Regions:
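FAD-site-proximal beta/loop scaffold in flavoenzymes
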Residues: 101-117, 230-278, 284, 290, ...
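Short, well-ordered coil/turn residues at beta-beta hairpins
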Residues: 82, 86-88, 93-95, 126, ...
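Residues at the starts of beta-strands that form the adenosine-phosphate
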Residues: 122, 144-148, 266
Length: 304
């Protein structure tokens, strides 16, 4: 029996979401559950795993005890022989008013997911000074009117980090006509929505025309149509780390040549939470299948 324990969805699917561009994650997950409902060996429950206890081996099998919180119920214990961690990552957004409210709707981190929809529009970069040159590399073929809002981070420390990454970073920004604004941002206000609900749903991409006003603690505001960001992220759940899974660069260590098994026998890590460094829906689907097929083959035939 396969037990899938699920939690809440992020706000939007990005442009790397197979053929489901613009589909809300809640519906995407609903459709996956509908398809899985035809298999009587799969059971899905809405619950949160808070702890994984490694019980060692019973013969040839790994054993685990899971502490699981169900809505409105006491914590339950569930046993498992194999565990697949699909816990994902979460972005660490700044507290600046307007960032979280508009995240994924004109403020984005992936130019290959959302950049084309804002091509040739006034673009803002939201990042520390030492991350700006890297963002410019990513969007240089899409936008020419670019402001870098470094939010007070233009100092000797970040300048040294920028020089370490790209010694000629100042000339590089000048070459691409990037204006660096070091003022402290007080708020990012949406002036216009770029919703494309009335666009032809058969099209793979349509322009989005958002508009924002960046306000500062001093001086005049600046208007931008979209923002490319560089914010840190973290594991959405710590259950893998608490179970002994090694973190490498903030990711769950997974061996891609062995079904994405972690350093803990019996525990696998898939999706963007693991160490193979890819963050999109097709990749998550692929890694899920790879882990499932691999661990399925680890059970003797009499248990299948």
């Amino acid at each position: 029996m396969l037990l899938a324990l699920t939690v809440s969805c992020p706000p939007t699917l990005d442009k790397t979401s197979t053929d489901n561009i613009g589909v809300q994650p809640a519906y995407y997950r609903y459709e996956a559950r509908r398809l899985l409902s035809y298999y009587d060996t799969v059971k899905m429950e809405n619950a949160t795993v808070t702890d994984i206890e490694n019980k060692g081996k019973n013969g040839n099998f790994t054993q685990f005890s899971l502490s699981v919180d169900y809505p409105g119920q006491p914590t339950k214990k569930i046993t498992a022989r194999k565990i697949v961690l699909a816990t994902g990552l979460q972005d660490i957004l700044p507290s600046t008013p307007g960032v979280a409210e508009n995240w994924g709707k004109g403020i984005f981190w992936c130019p290959w997911c959302d950049g084309h929809e804002h091509e040739d529009q006034p673009l803002g970069l939201l990042a520390p000074l030492n991350k700006i040159a890297g963002l410019v590399r990513e969007m240089a073929t899409l936008n020419r009117d670019v402001y870098a809002f470094v939010n007070g981070t233009d100092n000797s420390t970040t300048q040294a980090l920028a020089t370490k990454d790209l010694p000629q970073w100042k000339q590089y920004l000048q070459l691409h006509n990037v204006t660096v604004d070091n003022r402290t941002i007080s708020e990012i206000k949406r002036i216009k929505s770029g919703d494309t609900h009335n666009a032809d749903p058969s099209l793979p991409s349509v322009p989005e025309f958002d508009l924002f006003r960046v306000e500062f603690t001093e001086g005049k505001p600046v208007e931008r149509a979209a923002f490319l960001t560089s914010f840190p992220d973290e594991q959405r759940s710590d259950v893998g780390e608490k179970a002994g899974v090694e973190l490498v660069g903030g990711r769950l260590q997974a061996n891609a040549s062995a079904g994405l098994i972690t350093n803990v026998p019996g525990i696998y890590a898939i999706g963007d939470a693991n160490t193979d460094g890819t963050t999109n829906v097709p990749h998550a689907l692929f890694t899920g299948k790879r882990a499932a097929v691999f661990l399925h083959g680890k059970f003797p035939p009499r248990f299948l």
